[in-house]
Regions:
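Extracellular structured ligand-interaction cores
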Residues: 44, 66, 125, 199-202
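A residue-level signal for conserved active-site and pocket-lining positions in enzyme catalytic cores
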Residues: 47, 69, 114, 129, ...
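Short His-Asn-centered micro-motif
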Residues: 48-52, 72-74, 126-128, 134, ...
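Catalytic core and acceptor-binding pocket of nucleotide-sugar-dependent glycosyltransferases
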Residues: 172-270
Length: 270
């Protein structure tokens, strides 16, 4: 009798376990349309990251069919089968002397995929501290919709530009004088403080769209003129241009498909 009870409990456990698995599959499949799979398979897709200086380790990737992978770097790194990144060497050290100038140049590569990857339909930019751990096709099928061209994260810790300015000044990522100038300018233009705050370490773009190119160009000009902390200016440009094609990626998807590592040279601002 005892053995029968144990067997019943085991059967009941597996019944509920597989039922939960099946529900999760149904949830995923409900977000994936067969037409989207056909559409996605026709797109030329590129994943790229930027490694300037020695702030981060190189995180190897497992290549997925239908994607090309590029790393823009000033480091002496060769293409090799261990990392699977195709290296694009960029020499910024002669032309750009200060650390902030070099960071702003990094932002140029970050905001201009249409110049470097014009033969691709869709790009995925990931910060060098990110590693890919999940299936990218599945990730894209869960976030892409026809009417949006830019996809990125919402900031996990702050939601207003004033709080971000305070954090940047407190952790000395920019001078207090510059953060005051930015705040004054935004106030004069009536940029609302509660307009949201993006986190820009992961950006998916249909980067050849003309409106997307215009948005990215204006964003970079703002970075170049003011702060290299690009999260200070993204939502300002979003508001200023009245661009309607930005969509935030649910955080649960990024943790499912990407792993975030700490910088070697730790950036303590969160």
């Amino acid at each position: 009798m005892v053995n029968i009870n144990k067997l019943f409990i085991i059967i009941l456990f597996f019944f509920f376990f597989f039922n939960i698995l099946n529900k999760n599959k149904q949830i995923i499949n409900s977000e994936i349309n067969i037409n989207d799979i056909t559409y996605l398979s026709k797109l030329k897709k590129v994943v790229y990251t930027i490694l300037l200086g020695k702030n981060d380790n190189i995180h190897p990737i497992i290549k997925e069919k239908g994607y090309d992978y590029f790393m823009l770097t000033d480091q002496n790194i060769k293409n090799n089968s261990e990392t699977n990144w195709t290296i694009i060497n960029v020499d910024i050290n002669k032309k750009y002397k200060s650390k902030k100038e070099k960071i702003k140049r990094q932002r140029f590569y970050k905001t201009h995929p249409h110049l470097f990857f014009k033969n691709y339909d869709l790009s995925i930019y990931i910060d060098a501290k990110y590693a890919i751990k999940g299936n990218l096709d599945e990730f894209l099928l869960r976030i892409l919709t026809p009417k949006y061209y830019i996809y990125l994260l919402e900031h996990p810790n702050r939601s207003t530009i004033n709080n971000e300015l305070k954090a940047v000044a407190y952790f000395q990522k920019e001078s207090r004088n510059l953060t005051r100038i930015i705040k004054k300018r935004y106030n004069e233009e009536n940029f609302p403080d509660n307009n949201g705050l993006a986190e820009t370490c992961l950006i998916v773009r249909k980067h050849n769209d003309l409106n997307c190119i215009d948005f990215m160009t204006q964003w970079y000009e703002e970075i170049k003129l003011y702060s290299h902390r690009d999260q200070l200016s993204f939502n300002y440009i979003y508001w200023k241009t009245r661009y309607k094609y930005v969509k935030y990626i649910p955080k649960k998807y990024t943790t499912e498909y990407f792993t975030q590592h700490a910088h070697i040279i730790k950036d303590i601002i969160k």
